[in-house]
Amino acid sequence: MTERNASGRMNTKGRSIKETKKAMNEEVGPFTLFLVTLGADLINALQREGRLGLSHLGMAEHKRFENQVKIRKGREKTERKAVAPVRAREIKNKDSCFPHTHIGCEK
């Protein structure tokens, strides 16, 4: 029986690939290990050829989109910071207070 970590997965920390494969072979069997290894090799080969995942052009477009989102979020944050002091002044102004929403207001 192999060691397991808190999440129930095999503990592979500090093991070589050979030791990990041996432990997996004992755990799931040789055919399952073969299928997992074959699948991983296939995924790696497709990624190298650019047939799987984002292409270089796709990555550039994705990065541009991420940057636009960061810029938009930054603008929204700046706008919120500018509006917050105005709202704080309105709350301090007793004419704009409602008695059921502000504690300590005499209105």
Swiss-Prot record:
<keyword id="KW-0496">Mitochondrion</keyword>
<feature type="region of interest" description="Disordered">
    <location>
        <begin position="1"/>
        <end position="20"/>
    </location>
</feature>
<dbReference type="GO" id="GO:0005739">
    <property type="term" value="C:mitochondrion"/>
</dbReference>
<protein>
    <recommendedName>
        <fullName>Uncharacterized mitochondrial protein AtMg01040</fullName>
    </recommendedName>
</protein>
<feature type="compositionally biased region" description="Polar residues">
    <location>
        <begin position="1"/>
        <end position="14"/>
    </location>
</feature>
